[in-house]
Amino acid sequence: ARHGKLDGLALLRAAIEWEFPGRIALVSSFGAESAALLDMVSRVDPTVPVIFLETGKLFGETLDYRDALIERLGLTDVRDIHPDPAELETADPAGDLWSRDPDACCHVRKVVPLARALTGFDAWISGRKRFHGGDREGLTYIEADGAHIKINPLAGWTRDDIETYYEVRELPRHPLFEQG
């Protein structure tokens, strides 16, 4: 991983422009910390595909925030990815699988659709960070992920780094973050 020591923006530039041109996507939840990475990617290349998993369980505020960030950052290829309706009908006919089996819900609403969406890409960009804890504490900047390479440009960022980036870049906050 010859680019593993670069700062986040430099790592993104290397991955997007040199290592995987036209073969890399960003996966984003458009959640509370997402604007930082979306902004960084848009600064390198606003045409990079952004994969948004529309699970059918998201708050309206998240969808509004997604739309606002797309416009503000000039993102030109945001792809709303949905679970397969037939798979949902089989696995979660009542729409309450999340309350009975969160792992199965995540599988049908996120894992399977993401795998389909990543077909045709060699690499993808993730906003995961070590400070989120658990199995992320040992997160590296570049990792193998099955048939793909996963780029984690914010792996070493702290909460303060995120706050500073939002302030310096004057990024809007997620409406639910603002509500506490």
Residue ranges of predicted features:
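Nucleotide-activated chemistry modules centered on ATP-dependent adenylation/adenylyltransferase
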Residues: 1-180
